[in-house]
Swiss-Prot record:
Keywords, ordered alphabetically: Phosphoprotein, Ubl conjugation pathway
Domain of life: Eukaryota
Polar residues biased stretches: 1-14
Keyword Phosphoprotein attached: yes
Note on domains (UniProt): The BTB/POZ domain mediates the interaction with some component of ubiquitin ligase complexes.
Residue numbers spanned by region Disordered: 1-25, 77-97
Name used for this protein in its record: BTB/POZ domain-containing protein At1g63850
Purpose: May act as a substrate-specific adapter of an E3 ubiquitin-protein ligase complex (CUL3-RBX1-BTB) which mediates the ubiquitination and subsequent proteasomal degradation of target proteins.
Database matches in InterPro entries: BTB/POZ_dom, BTB/POZ_dom_prot, SKP1/BTB/POZ_sf
Pathway(s) annotated for this protein in UniProt: Protein modification; protein ubiquitination
Cited Gene3D superfamilies: Potassium Channel Kv1.1, Chain A
Organism of this sequence: Arabidopsis thaliana (Mouse-ear cress)
């Protein structure tokens, strides 16, 4: 290449004259940098030794010259044969550059390199065919079909009018007798058909090859889901019904990834293939498709999820129960609509757990410790259901129900702490929910909750803190402080003074709500002082007005 007089404008906006004042290696490096083939942060190669001849060009020179040799014209394949080496040097060079830039410099493959690789795959696809297959056979074909894409790829292949017409409604119309008579080719000349703006020429060719295949199912098994989706789109576009059915049969039986699942549902919805088997495919991911229009098959989402809740609540293996609770909570949390599980169903499950808890707790209070482990189990179940209710913003009725359980709070001290402390974890979760504004209830309900359950909560706090793994003490203390601070000031005083006395006598076994106490103190005494001074200021203002 001649670098003697050209002026190149680099990507940064500066132009670099290429004259004799610059070493040839620098100008070639600058040309490669301008073409986007090198990392701009890489240092330039050292100046060339003019007195030393090289037998072969350097890597920098090859990459620099490549930018000018890659042509802009579309690459064409005729009958599965790539252009001659002299005319295809730029394409093969681009493929080599792709390998070098990917493996050596870790750069993104350019559009020209991708085109060259695609052309090579298409060439291999057209050349290789099973014995007896007449696809792309120039000796027996009567149609020259040219496919061209938007990115400049153009392929001409030899196909058979009889096969295309028999399998495709598009080609049946395109190659109809009326159209054939208008063409009137000589007996030795094939018909010429051109299809432009193909999305993917390679997929289009594979779809045409299926028309020549006797066992489409076996042929389809060689492809992955992504390629089958491409074939399905082309088959639907050209009216290749056998190809559409084969693709749908494959998709119905093959496993999908989550990304493929979205693409499949989107494409089937776009193509409207319900009458030819798409519904069978969608039944894997759509309840409506599985149930049909009448919805008679299978249960509703609410029934299924309620059944799952009961299975988890009554499971025998504790480790498996914990794992499944986490899983079910995650799935319910991901469904933001909340229409899958009715409020009544959740509270029905809650009532069942609460009934068992009350029965076992009252028995334990009378020194009947048979099945006493059910107290902790049912309290844990209620804690889990409460989390779900809070996530769905429907926990207000639970707070009313829990605050009214005076029959349990009154006998709380009669049950050994090792069996009862899980109940206080439910109370703690309520404090956190109210303190964060996740649960909004009337002040009378909040006050009743504290009157019935605050003392039992204090009694269990030390044991709960030591026995419960992962317990966030500071989160609970902050929630309790905020819960008390939501009450009228006179009620706040009652609860904070009771805490103050208890904290001084059992420091470690009592939650530290000093922050809330300080807020109440400022509210109570500072404002009283301000209010006592306010009438005097008003009187002074009034007298000053009269004197004026």
């Amino acid at each position: 290449m001649d670098y003697s007089t050209a002026t190149t404008t680099a990507g940064n906006g500066y132009s670099s004259p290429r004259d004799s004042s610059f070493p040839s290696s620098f100008t070639k490096f600058n040309s490669a940098l301008t073409a986007g083939l090198l990392n701009p942060m890489s240092p330039p190669p050292p100046p060339a030794m003019h007195d030393k001849t090289r037998s072969s060009p350097t890597l920098f020179e090859m990459m620099a010259s490549e930018a000018d040799t890659i042509g802009k014209v579309p690459v064409q394949i005729h009958n599965g044969v790539l252009p001659s080496p002299s005319s295809s040097s730029s394409s093969s060079s681009a493929a080599a550059t792709a390998a070098r830039t990917t493996n050596v410099n870790h750069l993104v493959i350019s559009a020209q390199d991708k085109q060259a690789l695609a052309m090579q795959r298409i060439s291999d696809l057209l050349v290789i065919r099973s014995p007896g297959n007449q696809f792309n056979d120039p000796n027996s074909s009567d149609v020259k079909l040219t496919l061209s894409s938007k990115d400049g790829i153009s392929i001409t292949m030899c196909v058979h009018r009889q096969i295309l017409v028999a399998h495709s409604r598009f080609f049946a119309m395109k190659l109809s007798d009326r159209w054939s008579k208008q063409q009137l080719p000589p007996s030795s000349s094939p018909y010429i058909v051109e299809i432009s703006d193909c999305d993917d020429v390679e997929v289009y060719i594979e779809t045409l090859m299926l028309m020549y295949c006797r066992d489409l199912r076996k042929k389809m098994m060689r492809h992955d889901v992504s390629r089958v989706l491409g074939i399905l789109k082309v088959s639907a576009a050209i009216g290749f019904d056998a190809g559409v059915l084969s693709c749908l049969e494959y998709l119905e039986a093959a496993p999908w990834s989550e990304d493929e699942e979205y693409r499949i549902a989107s494409l089937l919805s776009e193509l409207h293939l319900e009458n030819v088997g798409a519904t069978e495919v969608l039944r894997r991911v759509s309840v409506e498709a599985s149930n049909g229009n009448n919805g008679s098959n299978g249960g509703s989402n609410d029934e299924v999820l309620l059944n799952l809740l009961h299975i988890v609540l009554e499971g025998k293996d504790e480790k498996a129960r914990r794992d499944m609770k986490t899983l079910v909570s995650k799935m319910l949390r991901e469904n933001s609509s909340g229409n899958d599980l009715r409020k009544e169903s959740l509270y029905l499950a809650c009532d069942g757990c609460l009934h068992k808890l009350k029965r076992q707790f009252l028995q334990a209070a009378e020194s009947d410790l048979e099945n006493v482990d059910q107290i902790a189990r049912q309290a844990d179940n209620l804690h889990w259901i409460l989390d779900i209710l809070i996530d769905r913003q429907i926990a207000e009725d639970f707070i009313v129900m829990w605050a009214s359980l005076s029959e349990l709070s009154e006998v709380h001290s009669k049950v050994p702490v090792v069996h009862r402390f899980e109940i206080s974890r439910v109370t703690a979760r309520i404090f956190v929910g109210i303190g964060k504004g996740q649960i909004l209830t009337p002040k009378e309900v909040r006050c009743l909750l504290l009157r019935n359950w605050l003392t039992p909560f204090y009694d269990d706090f030390g044991w709960m803190r030591r026995a419960s793994k992962g317990l966030d003490r500071y989160l609970i203390e902050d929630g309790l402080s905020n819960t008390i601070l939501t009450l009228p000031l006179a009620w706040q005083q009652e609860f904070f003074l009771a805490w103050f006395d208890r904290f001084l006598n059992s420091n470690e076994d009592c939650p530290n709500i000093q922050r809330g106490f300080e807020v109440w103190w400022r509210r109570a005494f500072w404002r009283r002082k301000e209010q006592s001074q306010e009438p005097a200021r008003l009187r002074v203002t009034a007298s000053a007005t009269e004197n004026s």
